[in-house]
Amino acid sequence: MKIAVVGSGISGLSAAWALKDTADVTLFEKRERIGGHSCTKTVDYDGRKIEVDVGFIVYNALNYPNLIAFFDALDVETERSDMSFAVSNPSGYEWSSNVRGFFAQKRNLFDPAFHHFWRSILRFNDIAREELDSRRVKDTTLGAWLDRHGFDENFRENYILPMGAAIWSTPEDRMLEYPALSFFRFFDNHRLMHKERPHWRTVTGGSQSYVKKVVAALGDRVRAGTEIRDVSRFGDQVKLEASDGRQHVFDHVILASHSDQSLAMLGDEFEDRRFMLRSIHYRPNQIYLHRDPALMPKHRSAWAAWNVLRQEGEDICLTYWMNTLQNLPKACPLFVTLNPNMPPAEDKTFSSFTFDHPQFDTPAEAAVREIKRVNGEGGLWLAGAWMGSGFHEDGLKSGLETALSLGGKVPWVPQNISPRRAPEKVAAEGAHLKIVGKNG
């Protein structure tokens, strides 16, 4: 069976890897670089070469069981990381989740508002866990839930909204539209509403270390620099057109791309999938890799792995302290910042680029449920982290679920993955998909 995978993020890589021994699989990527959000930049830091991740950075044993098994199968080396969190307000108000940083400003020790803020966090954790168990928050947005329980602006602006915005790379006002049940489920699963938190890890040498191992396993099945531009019906077949017109025929095609990218490729004959995908949106985030501490909290004691700098405008400004996250040399301060109103100093900036992230709301959740119901019909499969909560484990699960549905195999017992049978019509008719691509 010939299968094409379009897109080389975690979903496409895992799908192609799981299919490599059971099918004639080809992986297409429009860029020359393979890996999607698994992106490692090499910086020249005063003559010293340092590898820095700017997309996927960390994972944990509790919430990423398949990713851990994937890394074990690839023999990927990993190490401990840190996941502390800080908020810095334009008014000068700052705090971080580590003990030293919680009272980074000594005035917080004696500030009744700060103690009320701390009690509000505990109250949120208690009520959210209770209502999660009772399922009373179904079809309720986070904003409506916060209103119902009377959480004040201090709690919203300095804890729950910046934390949610940082996790999902989403403007704070959009977080108010996030489905409350999904929000609480994520916080509970990641132990963010509990005293005991999971230990986080990072890939030694950067995420490109695992990408290189997957690419090596796939060999000449990888076709970089091949952009698929159109997907349409062609009788009982499906035609995929790329930028230079070379043609290939496959039995199944997996579009392992962002939802908006898949939407742009699909022709009118796939209007059912197009209709669903229109409800799932992505948002660009401007990212800088730099060494400018001006984009960190003012108090050094408040510095954390994740630092939200609240600013005017709708975009969140988030700075990752990469030395803490990836155990990089402290003598070489390195930061990755998303969406600052004022970019880092030019002479302290190594590179800038854009990553797009999925935006989640109730219509998007409903659309994903419908896509899962029809996935594979007509030989067309959709996969991506956007089909879950947008994280690396979600992308891996989506890719593996699709691959296992088509007979792929992995050397572990998959967790929380439910393969579906390829639709009988496709199997019976042997419908082919035609791909027009650049690398014959």
Model-derived features with residue positions:
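N-terminal Rossmann-like FAD-binding beta1-loop-alpha1 element of flavoenzymes
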Residues: 2-27
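Conserved Rossmann-like nucleotide-cofactor binding loop
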Residues: 11, 33, 260
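Glycine-rich FAD pyrophosphate-binding loop
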Residues: 20-43
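N-terminal glycine-rich dinucleotide-binding loop that anchors FAD/FMN and/or NAD(P) in oxidoreductases
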Residues: 41-67
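Conserved flavin/dinucleotide-binding core of flavoenzymes
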Residues: 42, 98-99, 103, 315-440
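Mobile amphipathic helical/loop "lid" adjacent to a hydrophobic cofactor/ligand pocket
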Residues: 61-177, 184
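Helical element adjacent to the flavin cofactor pocket in flavoenzyme catalytic cores
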Residues: 185-243, 248
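Mid-domain catalytic core of redox enzymes
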Residues: 227-358
